[in-house]
Amino acid sequence: MKKYPKIGIRPTIDGRQGGVRESLEEKTMNLAKAVAELITSNLKNGDGTPVECVIADGTIGRVAESAACAEKFEREGVGATITVTSCWCYGAETMDMNPYYPKAVWGFNGTERPGAVYLAAVLAGHAQKGLPAFGIYGRDVQDLNDNSIPADVAEKILRFARAAQAVATMRGKSYLSMGSVSMGIAGSIVNPDFFQEYLGMRNESIDLTEIIRRMAEGIYDKEEYAKAMAWTEKYCKKNEGNDFNIPEKTKTRAQKDEDWEFIVKMTIIMRDLMQGNPKLKELGFKEEALGHNAIAAGFQGQRQWTDFYPNGDFSEALLNTSFDWNGIREAFVVTTENDACNGVAMLFGHLLTNRAQIFSDVRTYWSPEAVKRVTGKELTGMAANGIIHLINSGATTLDGTGQQTNANGEPAMKPCWEITEGEVEKCLEATTWYPANRDYFRGGGFSSNFLSKGGMPVTMMRLNLIKGLGPVLQIAEGWTVEIDPEIHKLLDERTDRTWPTTWFVPRLCDKPAFKDVYSVMNNWGANHGAISYGHIGQDVITLASMLRIPVCMHNVEEDQIFRPAAWNAFGMDKEGADYRACTTYGPIYK
């Protein structure tokens, strides 16, 4: 079982003994227990285990008790804190002073004791000390004996906790570059200062010859390889598609069989490089058994590798998927072309949702007029205002087929613990593995092809690095859509019929970047996007504010935005205030 950070609950209280404190002990501790129960009952880690909470041993009224609580949280592996109170407390004495923990304070809205007054006072202290905290204050007054958590308060607590757990989970992990810069793509020029200062992560790197060395020297689990090949023969190789290469570039059957064996070994080795494998230690490879402690990774592929060896499409697709030959499991985060910036966006989405993430080129905006000109047909329904073609060289998660279904029977991408074996088989059945286009991939290999089902709510994200400014985040909520099959066939074949397609329509609004579908495409900051199931823009914005990464483009309603209270001091324009606050506070780990 993986070890995850915990969320610390800090019940603060009026320190005046002799009647005041005593009358509040039970109430304050009950609120803390209610918050812990809310989080544990509603939030899970990537492996499906509940997010754990640690409550201080007692209420916190004076600074010595704050210190004792801090010591306990360090021992217990806490990564974020929520302070809870129903009354006045001594702000600077009782506040969380850890500079690395995301922090929130819930001040109970009641009349008998001034929890709201403490909330305002301690948030002023957090702002004054440069330790931003999220303020949580219920809209409606509650009675003193009411220990329930109102819906608006619960929503903010869970939004904070979800993002805070993501921050804490990233801290101390690695991003593994397998290879280096791919085709001059800026996102694959990995910036270690960003990872260290903003995410608390380190960067690891291997030359791609390490994969060949492990193949040649047998540094992989042979039993697992045999199991993996049998599974691949049953579920993937049987769905091998037509070879569209010209005869001179078409591989023989024997060569294709060798490619299948190669890419399966490659997948096992890439996973071992990320997380290690105790089986390798049993085989005598102690160093290789350790792995790189990578929570995300990227594979360069093009061009040096793919000009000579089978491409990484199968390996990337399977690792990004919530299942493989070992069964249903948490998806990994692996980027095509070692695009670390997109990898970070994928990681954000994965940690916030516990779901597999789609990696795609933001390839083409198709206007209704262009579609009519090319196909003679009109886009209809949700696609009527134009569509964005999300497509990449076969490396997209197979969860992206949309063959999983939610409780309402709608297409979905689900956390691994909700996926059924039947849904796994449907995802595999919906995927064709085409021999790689050898104009692009001279070394061969296989690329996945599928068409995502329409009707899934999704959020497309991208992290970009801007010289002189730093990291910025883009967010576009929308939906996958289905279009007339004849239109799809014509548009797909003039792009690349061996790669997977997701047709995307963003939700439009009165913001300039979202006035129409074209504007979303035109304002996108790079060639790739990370697509997560669900409308999670508000959670991404909360996470970005914790990491001090401004959001330059989003279509989230303003009343859904939840950032630290200190952001209110930077002006009434929310986007401008976000930039000013992020610049003022700077990265957490600098």
UniProtKB/Swiss-Prot annotation:
Keywords: Carbohydrate metabolism, Cytoplasm, Fucose metabolism, Isomerase, Manganese, Metal-binding. It holds the Pfam family Fucose_iso_N2. Pathway: Carbohydrate degradation; L-fucose degradation; L-lactaldehyde and glycerone phosphate from L-fucose: step 1/3. One of its GO terms (molecular function) is manganese ion binding. Transmembrane segments: none annotated. The keyword Glycoprotein does not apply. Mn(2+) binds at E337, D361, H528. It is found in: Cytoplasm. The active site is at E337 (proton acceptor), D361 (proton acceptor). Belongs to the L-fucose isomerase family. This is L-fucose isomerase. It comes from Bacteroides fragilis (strain ATCC 25285 / DSM 2151 / CCUG 4856 / JCM 11019 / LMG 10263 / NCTC 9343 / Onslow / VPI 2553 / EN-2).
